[in-house]
């Protein structure tokens, strides 16, 4: 579960998508099947590593998972089951660290917030996460507002 957790943190994939992720540490990106909500078709996406250096340090090109899929053999039942097992593994460890209510989506949303602080173009970040730019702004609006306030303060308080 460690590889999956580290990969979700570095690339911001949905938990189910992480089972399909193939890192390319040379480019600092990966390929992953995007599993959009609703009845939209799955497609390939190219998540960005935040950061490439950390992906290399954690050796994420040494893939360690018992299950994988691609566009042609996705099993939603198995993927959901393994996602639940993954969460059962993480929750007690998170509590030990003082994080009482960890969900796998928290790891993904952490990537979204870090992408804003890293200055990644919102269009690129939303594609990396596999959602629309509108969804991106809806989810991360408060972070953009915080960054805007900080930047405005820096300009007027030189």
Name the predicted role of every residue range:
Residues 1-6, 37-38, 78, 145:
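Conserved catalytic core of the tyrosine transesterase superfamily
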Residues 1-15, 19, 108:
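Basic, Lys/Arg- and aromatic-enriched nucleic-acid-binding interface segment
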Residues 7-8, 101, 114-115, 128, ...:
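Short alpha-helical segment immediately N-terminal to, or the first helix within
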Residues 17-18, 102-103, 112, 120-130:
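Active-site-proximal segment of tyrosine recombinases
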Residues 20-56:
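Conserved tyrosine-mediated DNA breakage-rejoining catalytic core shared by Y-recombinases
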Residues 25-30, 120-139:
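Short, polar N-cap/turn motifs at the start of nucleic acid-interacting alpha helices
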Residues 35-39, 129-153:
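Catalytic-site neighborhood detector that most strongly recognizes the C-terminal catalytic loop/helix
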Residues 47-100, 105-107, 111:
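Active-site/catalytic core of tyrosine-dependent DNA strand-transfer enzymes
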